[in-house]
Design a protein with these regions (language model features):
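Structural signature of tandem-repeat unit edges
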Residues: 1-3, 13-27, 37-50, 60-73, ...
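A structural signal for leucine-rich repeat
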Residues: 123-128
Length: 164
């Protein structure tokens, strides 16, 4: 199996709270977790290269999401309505973020990006209905304590995101 295609697979599974997507999956398909409001924890493997249209639509229980280094594309409305989402980790590999990908993410206020500011500016971001994505505070990755002013983050000794 290379793609999880929504079409009813996990649609509106409100009791689903946690899921680890198998390594065999390369694409999280259209609406696969749409309406899973109880979903609080998602582990996405490095085999996934795209998160498609409405993949996590209205997953209001998600508070943060780490997108793996393999993902290049975040589709239209992929995380639309994830009203509990407060932070996301966007890898350097992402080259496009679709229309309304983070629409309705009312509490999204922190974006941890694995690259520098100039790299972020190269991402093809469809700005329509992505206001929270573009207005959230962005933190750029730095393994060493930065000397320049700005917002930076690193991985701590436990592999967790930590702001400098």
């Amino acid at each position: 199996m290379t793609q999880w295609d929504g079409r009813g697979a996990f649609y509106d599974c409100n009791k689903l709270t946690s899921i680890t997507i198998p390594d065999s999956v390369t694409s999280i398909g259209v609406g696969v977790f749409s309406g899973c409001s109880g979903l609080t924890n998602v582990t996405i493997p490095n085999s996934v290269t795209s998160i498609d249209f409405e993949a996590f639509y209205n997953c209001s229980g998600l508070t943060n999401i780490t997108i793996p280094n393999s993902v290049t594309s975040i589709g239209d409305s992929a995380f639309k309505g994830c009203s509990g989402l407060t932070s996301i980790m966007v890898p350097y590999s992402v080259t496009s973020i679709g229309y309304g990908a983070f629409e309705g993410c009312t509490w999204l206020d922190k974006i941890y990006y694995q690259g520098a500011a100039e790299d972020w500016n190269k991402i093809d971001i469809e700005n329509t209905y992505n206001d929270k994505l573009t207005s959230a505070t962005r933190y750029y990755y730095s393994a060493e304590k930065p000397t320049a002013s700005g917002n930076y983050w690193r991985y701590n000794e436990n592999g967790e995101i930590e702001e400098w």
